Amino acid sequence: MRDIQFTKEALFDIEAAVLWYEEQRTGLSYDFELCLEAGIDAILRNPEAFQKKYKDIKIRFISRFPYGIHYTYNDNTIIVIAVFHTSRSPKNWSKRLGL
């Protein structure tokens, strides 16, 4: 099993989404976290399974929520770079992803 690491920016993305969903409806943030965890588990099981979006960065979309988990990986480690809302402009995140 590979290790998984999150950049500080990815952790901020997650925190911001959780706070936003909790403001929308009590308990919705919990649903988001469960779907996020399921997506991360799927990446851990088979990181090769998901679409290569740009360069060496892959994306796994989160079920029920309009977010994608952007990550890279090697033999030992998965690095989550970002958890972006799918409507965000590529101009906003291309710098963070090194594009």
Predicted segments, located by residue:
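Short, hydrophobic secondary-structure boundary micro-motifs
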Residues: 30, 51-53, 92
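Catalytic cores of transferase enzymes with a strong primary signal for eukaryotic protein kinases
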Residues: 9, 49, 95
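Basic/aromatic recognition patch in beta-strand/loop cores that engages polyanionic ligands
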Residues: 38, 45-78
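Enriched for short, Lys/Arg-rich terminal
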Residues: 72-99
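Residue-level recognition of specific faces of alpha-helices
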Residues: 8, 13, 17, 39-42, ...
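Arg/Lys-rich, positively charged N-terminal/basic patches that mediate binding to nucleic acids
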Residues: 1-33
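Generic structural signal for secondary-structure transition and capping sites
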Residues: 19, 26, 41, 45-49
